[in-house]
Amino acid sequence: MSAPFEERSGVVPCATPWGQWYQTLEEVFIEVQVPPGTRAQDIQCGLQSRHVALAVGGREILKGKLFDSTIADEGTWTLEDRKMVRIVLTKTKRDAANCWTSLLESEYAADPWVQDQMQRKLTLERFQKENPGFDFSGAEISGNYTKGGPDFSNLEK
């Protein structure tokens, strides 16, 4: 089986004071830099459908209402190399038209250029899912790609 689309084509990260976040059609990834040597028991992470909270050593790093809903039971977090916490959230709405413009409702918004690149990437990922025999990992997209690109579902085959 081939590597996931984001591994072949890269991601479009949105930088934050604590790390970065990025998204695919189905998931939102949050990468938080923590002090080297951090242990799992130092981490308090709460994941709900519309809320996320992360504290390390009692210090709140991230807390708020998510931009859109996620499937709470599928959210996970891991401590990697004792210096980064990765949170993976599964989107409830999994299509290219559901490109999050920010991580939280009022914080960590992608600037217009990053938002544009995120939308392009999600549209390409949508095309890859619809056409599994083609490799879109090195493709560029232009034209009508906002809101997931054109809808070809009602065209005759």
From Swiss-Prot:
The modification N-acetylserine is found at S2. GO terms for cellular component: centrosome; cytoplasm; kinetochore; spindle pole. Keywords: Acetylation, Centromere, Chromosome, Cytoplasm, Cytoskeleton, Kinetochore, Phosphoprotein. Residues 134-157 are annotated as: Disordered. PROSITE patterns: CS. CDD domains: p23_NUDCD2_like. It is found in: Chromosome, Centromere, Kinetochore; Cytoplasm, Cytoskeleton, Microtubule organizing center, Centrosome; Cytoplasm, Cytoskeleton, Spindle pole. InterPro entries: CS_dom (IPR007052), HSP20-like_chaperone (IPR008978), NudC_fam (IPR037898), p23_NUDCD2 (IPR037902). The keyword Metal-binding does not apply. GO terms for biological process: protein folding. Residues 14-104 form the CS domain. Pfam families: CS. The modification Phosphoserine is found at S142. The modification Phosphotyrosine is found at Y145. GO terms for molecular function: unfolded protein binding. Interacts with LIS1. May regulate the LIS1/dynein pathway by stabilizing LIS1 with Hsp90 chaperone. This is NudC domain-containing protein 2.
